[in-house]
């Protein structure tokens, strides 16, 4: 029996790993990012730790910080519009599984416009094109969404979770920076650690 194993193009690990961002971006010729995160990470300064690196390197970006816990179809749809309006050619996802899942949904619909919305990608998705490149910077150690080919979105109309599986949505680069995780409240860090176990 033959099995297939899909991984990111490259992963960086260690305290301060976010400082590799300018090199990662320049080496790939990417021009403008849509930063996908949530208001809590903006409020507590965790996202700022990444944005400061982008600012210091004069990297263009716009922020979509409306990610909700357990993101919904409408949440992803708003992100798709933000990405198109920003004319971003790559995505930087900062956060836990919700930010990663939202970024995947945004990225795959933007590059596969024949699909009306994320609902049409439930199950094993039939996309043909790779999603916009995603650089994933996890702030939790729970779902490993920065390295997987699946994402979970809530369909509000049916009131159920959709699992989407698509090799085209795996983040191109994972940057696992312990300093981002240190910055979270201890209770959240502990809870996501238990989730990983």
Set out the residue ranges of the language-model regions.
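A glycine/threonine-rich phosphate-anchoring loop and its flanking beta-alpha core
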Residues: 19, 112-196
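Conserved beta-strand elements of the Class I
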Residues: 34-35, 90-92, 135
């Amino acid at each position: 029996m033959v099995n297939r194993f899909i991984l990111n193009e490259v992963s960086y690990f260690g305290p301060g790993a976010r400082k590799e961002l300018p090199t990662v971006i320049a080496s790939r010729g990417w021009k403008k990012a849509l930063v996908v995160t949530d208001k809590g990470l903006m409020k507590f300064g965790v996202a700022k730790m990444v944005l400061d690196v982008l600012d210091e390197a004069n990297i263009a970006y716009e922020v979509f910080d409306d990610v909700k816990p357990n993101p919904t179809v409408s949440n992803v749809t708003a992100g798709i519009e933000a990405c198109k309006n920003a004319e971003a050619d790559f995505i930087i996802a900062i956060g836990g599984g919700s930010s990663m899942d939202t970024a995947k949904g945004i990225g795959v619909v933007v590059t596969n416009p024949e699909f009306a919305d994320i609902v049409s990608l439930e199950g094993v998705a039939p996309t043909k094109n790779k999603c916009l490149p995603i650089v994933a910077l996890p702030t939790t150690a729970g779902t490993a969404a920065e390295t997987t080919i699946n994402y979970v979105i809530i369909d509000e109309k049916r009131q159920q979770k959709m699992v989407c599986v698509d090799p085209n949505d795996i983040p191109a680069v994972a940057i696992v920076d312990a300093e981002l995780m240190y910055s979270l409240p201890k209770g959240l860090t502990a809870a996501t650690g238990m989730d990983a176990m």
